[in-house]
Amino acid sequence: MADLFFGGPFRRILYGRPFPPDWASASATAAMDWVETPTSHVLRINVPGLGKDDVKVQVEDGNVLTVRGAAPHAAAEKEREREKDVVWHVAERGRPEFAREVALPAEVRVEQIRASVDNGVLTVVVPKEPAPARPRTRPIAVSSKL
């Protein structure tokens, strides 16, 4: 009896996502690690399945690092076109998109930022400005007119 009520279409309503993915926000946030070394800030962002052409990294408003990514959807569209006579029950693997903004510290070299993708991880290296040289202490001779 319980299987009659909780099975079939009701199972998806009770145990599935509360909203279809299209109703959720247009972009998700990708998981990120941010470490600081003596010479740079290193950000590692999970981008599974994405290549260098699928990710966009830029600096906006002076020091806001923006990372956006979207999986190519051409392969998924071709797959759906080939399967015209099938019935889709769930389609959650669509075109995942994400966006992430990070306010960078003021003491960084924005023009030297590097980014690379390897094994589903985007690594962004933001070099630091070198610390200003501390002036050496030097004695100053004091003169007198007497």
Curated annotation (Swiss-Prot):
* Entry's localization field: Peroxisome
Provide the GO biological process annotations.
protein complex oligomerization; protein folding; response to heat; response to hydrogen peroxide; response to salt stress
Q: Which positions fall inside the sHSP domain?
A: 23-143
> Which segment of this protein is annotated as the motif Microbody targeting signal?
144-146
The record's principal subcellular location, in a coarse class, is: other
Q: Name one GO molecular function term.
A: unfolded protein binding
Q: Which UniProt keywords are listed?
A: Peroxisome, Stress response
Task: Summarize subunit and interaction data from the UniProt record for this chain.
Answer: May form oligomeric structures.
- Name of the protein in its database record: 16.0 kDa heat shock protein, peroxisomal
The organism encoding this protein is Oryza sativa subsp. japonica
- Chain's gene name: HSP16.0
